[in-house]
Amino acid sequence: MKKCITLLRKSYLPICLASLFLVSCTTETITTDNTELNAVYAKSSSKKDYMVILKAESIPDGFESQMESLGATVKSVTPEIGVAVISASTKVSNAIASKSDVRSVVPDYNVQWVDPQLHPEASPLSIGSDEWFFDDLWGMDAIDAPEAWNTGQTGEGVRVAVLDSGIDGTHPDLTPNLNTDLSASFVEGEEWQVRPGFYFNHGTHVAGTIAAADNSFGVIGVAPNAEIVAVKVLSEYSGSGPFSSINAGIVYAALIDADVINMSLGATFNKNGFIPTPDGLIKVPGKFIAEIKHAQQRAINFAYRNGTTIVVSAGNGGTNFDVNGSALKLPAGLNNVISVSATAPFSWVENPLGDLDIPASYTDYGRSHVTVSAPGGDFDSPSGFWYYDMVLSTIPGGWSWSAGTSMASPHVAGVAALIIGKNGGQMDPHEVTKQLTNTADNLDGNGSSLYHGKGRVNAYRAVTE
């Protein structure tokens, strides 16, 4: 079928695509070096921010004054899930934890949700004003997005919240669909909009895959007429953020009636008590992990009950979660989320008609862990053009390639937007998930695949079956 949407390959800023990225969930290996752990834990022990998780999923009247009377300062509250963030001493936090209406008090750890490390550099050509970007978007062909557009489905009227590290609010591929009034930041000291001077921004790249506009310019997203809202929950500088920011961002997205949340973020925790932070792994009580998981599940459930479909990246650790029972992936390991693994071609430039659905070399997997798969790109081809196996999308000031389950998740979020748009909006997340999985292409495993879950999403089938 011919593509009815075409894009002029232009560059509004001259850029050189010299650095390529592997992004999404941190892949740091858990260590048992007690010396290292103790050193990092000692550094973390000076943290003063705690999450107060109440037994009820609400905040009682007079809560702030009550906390102040005990010697704590309330920094924020998320009453919809009964969670508050306080600044307090260890002694005061212990006193609060003993109150009858408090379920638990846990440190609000700053977690490394996105690996900031660059993938080894390549030296592709600079993008010129006379080139076409569309031909490089192999992921759109893999999921039959052009065929879906030809049916008239483009995500019109659907709101997608991008919970990430902000968005470049000036990018011409994004501004037509970006709701700046609703965009918000939950990162202390940072605006939702990415500041100038950063070559790569994770959230900007993700947003382009979801809903870069059909404007005869640059790239195009899976749902080119969907509205996107930047909900900044990670620092644009480090890719890290506290649990409370993630939870508050999820609730906010639901409150503004987002139809879809995309979270191309995640971290692997050990159920016995290890947390990945920007300073390394720290050892914490296992019960803290359980309570942190409980609080985040509350946020997910709130959004789900409010009609928001939640799409998340499965992770980049190459872990089989069917056999690693001690590992916990958040948020992909929670209920009521669509967890997305990554696929890619191999030497696509040299073999453009080859398989586009090879499981990516890094992707986390497992029948218990993956809902569906989608294009995420890879970098293991020996070809001199290996970077074309990655996903091309928007970055501040231009476009760049990147690979990871972070790139797979927005493909699925875009397809979810197409489904909801066809339904006229306000669609039950359970029904969205059902349509995604029922129309996914079964690549192996008869719809229960180790790497693909129910299959690789198919945009055309999703809006026609």
Regions from the PLM with identified roles:
Residues 122-227, 233-235, 248-249, 255-256, ...:
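Active-site core segment of subtilase-fold serine proteases
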Residues 2-13:
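Bacterial N-terminal signal peptides that target proteins for export
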